[in-house]
Amino acid sequence: MPQQNYLDELTPAFTPLLAIKEASRCLLCHDAPCSQACPAQTDPGKFIRSIYFRNFKGAAETIRENNALGAVCARVCPTEKLCQSGCTRAGVDAPIDIGRLQRFVTDFEQQTGMEIYQPGTKTLGKVAIIGAGPAGLQASVTLTNQGYDVTIYEKEAHPGGWLRNGIPQFRLPQSVLDAEIARIEKMGVTIKCNNEIGKTLTLEQLKAENRAVLVTVGLSSGSGLPLFEHSDVEIAVDFLLRARQAQGDISIPQSALIIGGGDVAMDVASTLKVLGCQAVTCVAREELDEFPASEKEFASARELGVSIIDGFTPVAVEGNKVTFKHVRLSGELTMAADKIILAVGQHARLDDFAKLEPQRNTIKTQNYQTRDPQVFAAGDIVEGDKTVVYAVKTGKEAAEAIHHYLEGACSC
């Protein structure tokens, strides 16, 4: 792979002709499996047909009907595990590149100034959302379309959550995220940044001022390991935030060792390679057949030159040297690097939601409703997958649950 820039997307975009050519490979399945496999119900089968018939506006309308973050999901979704996994075309040669087609459509939407979303009526009262990540943003759109006056309270200086603070710009450009958020604000959604529960406002205050409250705080804090408690290591989320805020203008070591095998570990490793680190190695306790990273992330990291060692877990650390033991076999492996980064998981900060009785990183809900009937939860803090598209799914479903509750249409 040629030398990359942190601000340039790794995957090239389709031109209109290439998009139509790719869409023409679609077998136009009845009850398309790809559409059944999208958690956000984005309906790839339908928008691919529209692309094939040169109806790009219709394709954009299909995507936006169920996904307020269509341009984001087009870039970061593990499509090989979701919509593309059911593509019938795979039985002929290769599945349709659904992610790049969705990216083409949403880019076309932005470039041509389409205005698919309309301002909300705000006739059904006020709803507050805590957290401006993917679940909160999607929920705000669904609630606004239903007629609610929605305000999102975000603790950071800018909205977006992990989309802004964690995902590298060569995977998700800031301009793409900014355009998605601007589209949502144009509907009439109010986003108030620098507002954190427990500091500038309380949950009880929001309950008093709104008909319902939706909690969508994410897993924004990186986890460590006791073994490295006194070592000079950096947590993955801190490294990614530092690189993102500096737009890649950070000092880079000659060699780096990343402990972990998920998508965050791949993002760290890829960022280091893109920024010029000569030797980057990821060591994960999972073996390759159970590797947690998506195939797309894994392949991208390998193409950039990242070395992957599977099936090893750290057992000792001394300075810049880490000793690993294989999870099944005997024998040890010792590696040294200028920098060690831990990518072993993330957790939520739920201390200010004690009344909702959170357990570790989860708030228990029934149909997204917490033990407090006025308070709902969605996103990473409810049980389930931790992908952006799943957060979109839960945000939309939680908004629908709020609407049913407020309108007295359910027994919850």
Swiss-Prot record:
Keyword DNA-binding included in the entry's annotation: no
What does the record give under GO molecular function?
Answer: dihydropyrimidine dehydrogenase (NAD+) activity; iron-sulfur cluster binding
- Keywords assigned by UniProt, alphabetized: NAD, Oxidoreductase
Give binding positions for NAD(+).
E286
> What catalytic activity is recorded?
5,6-dihydrouracil + NAD(+) = uracil + NADH + H(+); 5,6-dihydrothymine + NAD(+) = thymine + NADH + H(+)
Report which superkingdom the organism of origin falls in: Bacteria
What Enzyme Commission number does this protein have? 1.3.1.1
SUPFAM superfamilies per the record? alpha-helical ferredoxin (SSF46548), Nucleotide-binding domain (SSF51971)
Into which EC class is this enzyme placed?
oxidoreductase
Q: One matching Pfam family, short form?
A: Pyr_redox_2
Which Gene3D superfamilies has this protein been placed in?
Alpha-helical ferredoxin, FAD/NAD(P)-binding domain
Q: Does the keyword Cytoplasm apply?
A: no
Protein role: Involved in pyrimidine base degradation. Catalyzes physiologically the reduction of uracil to 5,6-dihydrouracil (DHU) by using NADH as a specific cosubstrate. It also catalyzes the reverse reaction and the reduction of thymine to 5,6-dihydrothymine (DHT).
**Subunit structure, per the record?**
Heterotetramer of 2 PreA and 2 PreT subunits.
**What family does this chain come from, according to its entry?**
Belongs to the NADH dehydrogenase family.
Record protein name field: NAD-dependent dihydropyrimidine dehydrogenase subunit PreT
Provenance organism: Escherichia coli O157:H7
